[in-house]
Each structure stands twice: as structure tokens, then as C-alpha cells.
Amino acid sequence: MIEVKGKFITLAGSLMSLYPEQREKADAVLFRRTGKHWNELDPDGFYDTGIYKSFLDAYCEGSITGEKALITLGRNYFPTIKKLGGIPDNINDELDMIVFSTRSFAEDHKGSGIRPIKVMKARKGDVVLDIPDCGYDCRLGEGVYLGILSIYGIDNGLVVQERCIKKGNPTCEFHISW
């Protein structure tokens, strides 16, 4: 079983304020499994990614954009982490932040089969990442990297998924350019 830190479930729950019925539905799954609500979780405690996925699915269900809402959700991750002081001082630019996000992923997940994100290429303006499957829709990752670029004022960056496990590839690969 793969697990994710509670801070991501809490963030998803907080971003679902526009969709209270869907948040309650996902929160009921969480409460049945843990005895806690989305805003009561230990931010650094680990919880089954199936619970997190129930929040992601409910978020999509509530949004008029459907699964594209995951891009919006992902875009909020690192800007929120930055606002909360969770970015090390030695992160100087978008390239540093993308590389940091690969280490952060490994620290924020645990379980059988989890592996770090592999950096295939990392040059200013051009990054390729090999991302493991955690059962999340890949649009979440697309949003994460667009959100990182936006922190540095880059609004015209591109995140292109070149390979996908769900399409029969052995791994997911994202090409990030700006």
C-alpha cells in the first residue's frame, strides 16, 4: 500500500470549499478509515493514497471542469507550500524548485513500489522527469509543475506528458519547458 502525507489531503480538503457536498463525501471516507476529518490530520502523518484519491475524485465531481480541475489543484501545491514556509532557503529558481519537488515527492510518499521521481534531463528551461505511478491522474502532476513555474512568474511554460502508464507505457514522463 502506498501512503501520502496528511498535508496533501488537508490541502485538497481546504481547496474544496466551493464543493461542500463533495468534500463531505470524501471526508466520510477519511473518517471511516481514520476517525479524523480532513482538517484534523497530522500533516506529516501517512495515510492511504486511496483516501487522497477519494478527495481528488470528489474534487473533479464537484468542478464544472471535471478532471481538468486536477490541474488547478496541482497548481496550488507548491505556491501553498511556499506560503507556509516549506521551501528550503537554497531554492533559487524554477529549476531548483522542480528538482526539489522530485525529492519532496519521495519524502511525502511511502510504501511498496514507491520510488523517487527520476530526473532524466535538467537544464534551465528544459526538464524531463520520469514519474512513478501512485494511482493519481497525471493532470495533477501537470498542475504541480505549472504551479512551480508560476511561482517564478512563468505563465507561458508547458508541461507535456510524453509517456503514460495508463496508455501502456512502463512509466510516465513529463517534459517541462519554459
Predicted regions span which residues?
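Amphipathic interaction/junction segments at domain boundaries or subunit interfaces
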Residues: K36-R139
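Short terminal or interdomain "cap/linker" segment that borders an active site or interface and mediates
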Residues: M1-V4, G13, H109-C138, E142, ...
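N-terminal leader/assembly segments
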Residues: M1-T65
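Functionally constrained cores in energy, signaling, and assembly domains
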Residues: Q22-K25, E94, G157, Q161
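Residue-level preference for well-ordered alpha-helical positions
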Residues: F31, L149-S150
